């Protein structure tokens, strides 16, 4: 309690605990060294150490041991507990967040010190990361497969050795009907702990695959370590003969999506704001909040507008109110704080014959289903009459101006400002968003 903590402070006692390995696997022995130090006047003579374990850890109890405090003022003890075979993994953290005991220490070192004022107790919890001997993960899943166009799909499986020393395992692949792999078992050898190996997989695709998710699984034979990877088959047309420049912010979604599309693309730098460089691109994407983090864009915004005027297409993604100036756009455009937080809020297409909804992919009502998080935020609240609103969307009971997707002709080119959360959906390979994004590239 409080009195105990106060007495420990007054006596200037400290308990230091060292663990030889904080990332452990079931079946491993670890070494815990605990040292009690009396930093003040020597008033601690005898220390009783004990090692406690959480009731879910189930280890053999270790009898408390007494240690005399040395002339230097310290006393130490070493424990070598065995990590039980059935101890649940805690990594990867993002998958284990809601497991029982996720953030609870598996062990606690307790030091009880006898003094003139009674017995004082110091406690030091030990939180370990528990890993399977070898972990397995699909890299960059879900995988995009274009129905009727792709006849093979390549993917990578990452194996990581957490076992101290060398390790050899067998990886077994399970493939759903419609996909096939020439090899389904792989032997993987590791020289030491922390080693990683990539196992490349090539799948053959049956003709006339249905557009849906196909779930693959990879398992380390003889263990509980496994992972699932989704191959997402999508009806998707991608425009030909395009080249895309991205004025990137802190996000990589658009670059990653263009790579998945196999579309030639480049991340633009300060050296690229010249007519010769910009005109090399059919479309330039201004990434989310780029005007906040790219001062070179702010300084060279006129070069971007001139690019549009000469016939280019600029697609500007969402920004927050304070980082946007209405003169960034070719005609005045002011951002508000309107947002649509309901992820399945109805979408009304205001210009159904517009190319954005028809070329090369025809967009239908179901393309808007299954969004993650909100529809969008910081929608434009006022804009010049030369913009055409393409989409209306609002939360129930609200009716903000339809500014979530505004398009205009400027000179010989096209300028699109859109505050919808496309990037979140593209990260997830949302099929409808993939189709609309491909249509944006064709504007």
Predicted segments — roles?
Residues 18-240:
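Long beta-sheet-rich domains in secretory-pathway and surface-associated proteins
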Residues 223-287, 318-321, 341-342, 424:
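Aromatic-Pro/Gly-enriched surface loop or interdomain linker
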Residues 130-151, 162-163, 169-171, 233-237, ...:
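Extracellular ligand-binding/catalytic regions of CAZymes and related secreted enzymes
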Residues 255, 278, 301-305, 434-437:
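Extracytoplasmic/secreted envelope proteins and their assembly/folding machinery
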Residues 269-274, 299-302, 399-405:
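Alpha-helical scaffolding within the catalytic cores
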Residues 1-19, 26-28, 40, 414:
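Mature extracytoplasmic or organellar-lumen-exposed domains after removal of signal/transit peptides
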Residues 289-369, 418, 432:
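A glycine-rich, often tryptophan-bearing local segment used as a flexible ligand/cofactor-contacting loop or short
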């Amino acid at each position: 309690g409080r009195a105990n903590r106060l007495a420990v402070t007054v006596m200037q006692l400290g308990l230091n605990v060292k663990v030889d390995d904080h990332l452990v696997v079931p079946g491993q022995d670890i070494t815990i060294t605990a040292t009690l130090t009396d930093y003040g006047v020597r008033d601690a003579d005898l220390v009783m150490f004990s090692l406690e374990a959480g009731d879910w850890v189930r280890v053999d109890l270790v009898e408390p041991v007494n240690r005399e405090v040395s002339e230097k003022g310290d006393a130490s003890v070493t424990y070598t507990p065995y990590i039980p075979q059935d101890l649940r993994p805690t990594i990867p953290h993002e998958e284990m967040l809601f497991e029982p005991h996720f953030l609870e220490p598996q062990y606690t070192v307790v030091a009880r010190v006898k003094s003139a004022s009674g017995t004082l107790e110091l406690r030091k919890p030990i939180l370990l990361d528990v890993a399977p001997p070898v972990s397995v993960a699909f890299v960059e899943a879900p995988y995009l497969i274009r129905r009727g166009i792709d006849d093979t799909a390549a993917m990578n499986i990452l194996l990581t050795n957490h076992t101290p020393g060398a390790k050899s395992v067998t990886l077994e692949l399970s493939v759903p009907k419609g996909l096939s792999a020439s090899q389904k078992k792989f032997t993987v050898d590791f020289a030491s702990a922390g080693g990683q190996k990539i196992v490349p997989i090539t799948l053959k695709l049956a003709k006339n695959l249905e557009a849906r998710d196909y779930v693959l699984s990879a398992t380390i034979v003889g263990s509980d370590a496994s992972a699932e990877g989704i191959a997402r088959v999508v009806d998707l047309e991608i425009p030909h003969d395009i080249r895309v420049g991205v004025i990137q912010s802190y996000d990589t979604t658009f670059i990653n999506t263009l790579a998945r599309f196999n579309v030639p693309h480049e991340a633009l730098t300060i050296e690229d704001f010249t007519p010769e460089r910009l005109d090399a691109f059919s479309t330039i994407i201004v990434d989310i909040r780029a005007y906040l983090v790219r001062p070179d864009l702010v300084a060279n915004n006129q070069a971007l507008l001139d690019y549009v005027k000469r016939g280019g297409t600029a697609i500007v993604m969402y920004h927050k109110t304070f980082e946007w100036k209405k003169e960034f756009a070719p005609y005045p455009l002011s951002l508000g704080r309107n947002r649509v937080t309901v992820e399945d809020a109805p979408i009304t297409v205001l210009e159904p014959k517009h190319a954005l909804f028809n070329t090369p992919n025809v967009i239908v009502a179901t393309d808007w289903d299954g969004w993650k998080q909100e529809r969008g935020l910081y929608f434009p609240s006022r804009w010049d009459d030369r913009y055409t609103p393409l989409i209306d969307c609002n939360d129930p009971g609200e009716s903000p101006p339809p500014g979530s997707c505004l398009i205009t002709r400027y000179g010989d080119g096209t300028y699109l400002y859109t505050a919808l959360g496309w990037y979140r959906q593209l990260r997830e390979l949302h099929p409808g968003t993939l189709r609309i994004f491909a249509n944006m590239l064709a504007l």
